[in-house]
Amino acid sequence: MHLLRLSCWAALALTLTWPVASAANSPTKPSGIASAAPCGELVATLPNVRRELCESAQLVPVARSVRGRLIYARDIVPTQPGLRVLVVGAIHGDELSSAAVALHWIRLAGQPPADTPQSIHWRFVPVLNPDGVLARPPTRVNASGVDLNRNFPTPNWQRDARIYWEKRTSRDPRRWPGPQPLSEPESRFLHEQMRSFNPQLIVSIHAPYGVLDFDGPSVPPSRLGRLYLDQVGIFPGSLGNYGGVHKGVPVVTVELPNSLRTPLDAEMRQMWFDLLRWATERLGPVATGGRTP
C-alpha cells in the first residue's frame, strides 16, 4: 500500500513537471507556491472568471515577470501524446479577455469530446504579462514599457523593429519593441518554451479586432466560432513573425472582439472545438511522422 501511494504521487509529479527556461535566460522556477495562489488577483481582475474556474486550472508557477510576479502555466498531457500545442494569453496586459478565454480553454482541454481523437499535449500560459494585467489601469506593455509582441528575435530586428516603431507607429509608447530582442524576462521565458517544449502549433490569444490571423506553414483555419480568417500582416519582433515565418511553426492568432468581455460560454466552446478539430485534421499527421494519430 505504501509503494502504491508513492507511485501515485510520482505520477502526479511527472504530470505537473516540465522544462522551464534555463537560469541563463529566465529566473529560476519558484518553489513551494500553492497552485491556487494567483486566483484572488485573477478573479478580481479578469472578466468571466470565477474562483472555481481558476482553481480548477491547477496553475503551476514557472517564471517571474519584471516586477517579480509569478507567471503560471498548466500542462494537459494525453496517454499517448503526439501534437504539442502552446497556448498563450495576455501577452498584452490590457487584453484581459485573452487570459480569461485561456482559463476557460484549460477546462475544455481537460474534458475532450468523445468523438475527437485526443493525442495533443497542451501547454497553457494564460497570463504572460502579469505586470500589465495587474497594473491599474491594465497596460499593453510590461513593467519596463516594452510591447512583448514586438520583442522576439526576428531577422534584422535591430534595424527593422526600430524603423517600424518610429515610422509606422510614430513612436507610440504602447508599441515600443524594447532596447534589444528578448530584453524582457517574459519574452525570454516564452522563447525558451519554444525551444524546450518545441511546439508544433502556437495559439496566441489577443483582442479586440475580432478576427483570426495565421502565420506559417499548413492550411490555416477558415474560422474559429464567429471569428473568420483575415490575415493582417506581420510586424518586426512579433510572435507570429518569429514563430510562424522565421521558425516555421504555425501560429494561430485569435483576436477576440472585446478586450474587457469574453465571448459567451457557448461561443468559447465553439471556438475551442473548431481549433481542436482543425489541429487534429491538419497537424495531427505532422506530429506522428505522417501517420494518422
Regions found by a protein language model. Name each.
Residues 1-5:
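Positively charged n-region of N-terminal signal peptides that target proteins for export
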Residues 73-81:
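Short beta-strand-to-loop junctions in surface cap/lid or active-site-entrance loops
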Residues 59, 73, 124, 202, ...:
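Conserved beta-strand scaffold positions in the cores of enzyme catalytic domains, especially
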Residues 7-17:
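Bacterial N-terminal signal peptides
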Residues 211-216, 221-225, 237-293:
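Active-site-adjacent mobile loop/cap segments within catalytic or ligand-binding domains
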Residues 82-86, 96-231:
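Active-site/substrate-binding loop(s) of hydrolase catalytic cores
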Residues 22-71:
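Short glycine- and acidic-rich boundary segments immediately preceding or forming the N-terminal edge
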